[in-house]
């Protein structure tokens, strides 16, 4: 009798929550960066949400500083939002709140991107996801090339690191960059041109910088 092997179905990859970080004050820009027009159409907000949807489908949320901030960035009612539990504690607070939400709702981790990176691509995010699936208990971060620099707000954080991120929030420096440089993580190289962030009108060029 010939034994036949039955192929077992592949296990579904653990679910990721896509988190758009849009809680900054945009003080140097003078207007919410989420509302800036994107070169490919729409706004920085709509472009960033569409980019995340192509990776995480509808499993996305927007991290904001407060309920009042939701109206300021004109977030559509259909898009869920998370709010910082304490004000003015920087992006580490948004990361911590998102990880707590992900853990409570059955997600394995969060894919974070800021709203002010207009040139980041879907392929860049997929490269992070691919690296994370190889080692889903590790933090995966974008590593800017030329010059090299870690980008702690572009990456995947597993819910297992929730407590360590909360300790960053409670620390004196509250710096993800400082903490992650000395912690265990893996990196994915992404060209610096695609990690260009926009902080002032001059970063946008004409006609926004009045030159």
Curated annotation (Swiss-Prot):
Family assignment from sequence similarity: Belongs to the MobA family.
Organism: Rhodopirellula baltica (strain DSM 10527 / NCIMB 13988 / SH1)
Key words, A-Z: Cytoplasm, GTP-binding, Magnesium, Metal-binding, Molybdenum cofactor biosynthesis, Nucleotide-binding, Transferase
A single GO molecular function term of this UniProt record: molybdenum cofactor guanylyltransferase activity
Record's comment describing the protein's domains: The N-terminal domain determines nucleotide recognition and specific binding, while the C-terminal domain determines the specific binding to the target protein.
Record-given protein name: Probable molybdenum cofactor guanylyltransferase
Main localization (coarse): cytoplasm
Chain segments annotated as transmembrane: none
Pfam families noted in UniProt: NTP_transf_3
Compartment(s): Cytoplasm
